[in-house]
Amino acid sequence: MTQDNSQAKAKAPAKSARRRARELALQGLYQWLLNRNDPGVVEAHLQDAQGFNKADRAHFDALLHGAIREETTLTEAFTPYLDRPVAELSPVERAALLVGAYELVHCVDIPYKVVINEAVELTKTFGGVEGYKYVNGVLDKLATQVRAVEVAARR
């Protein structure tokens, strides 16, 4: 006897436009980290991706181009919280850290816990088995530096 589990399975909530923007930015940063292609070429490639038209375009542009433009500064900001050299990070972890660091520094309208959670979810989706824990720890420590008042108020 079989049972229909279609109703028992919870339907995944629709992705928000910002989540799609983060996913696409992460994918673009991944490509850029591996190939160092011109950001315009990376963006053009992503425009053909499924769901691009449903992404928050302004947020995507800010994340992709901002993280590439400020890669050195953002990397310097989170490097003190790494337990290994930046070169040993997986490209997905590094891209997630760049997205998260950029949002922590520049998107102060987004609560730091949301920024960290979104980076963790990106890493769970695209990264290795335990990579999300690492990204969580690094961004949590970075948040205490760049959003000290907000972190202190929430703890």
Curated annotation (Swiss-Prot):
Cited Gene3D superfamilies: NusB-like (1.10.940.10)
InterPro entries: NusB-like_sf (IPR035926), NusB_fam (IPR011605), NusB_RsmB_TIM44 (IPR006027)
One MF term in the entry's GO annotations: RNA binding
GO cellular component assignments: cytosol
GO BP annotation list: DNA-templated transcription termination; transcription antitermination
Record key words, sorted: RNA-binding, Transcription, Transcription antitermination, Transcription regulation
Keyword Transcription regulation: yes
Similarity comment text for this entry: Belongs to the NusB family.
Biological function: Involved in transcription antitermination. Required for transcription of ribosomal RNA (rRNA) genes. Binds specifically to the boxA antiterminator sequence of the ribosomal RNA (rrn) operons.
Name of the featured protein: Transcription antitermination protein NusB
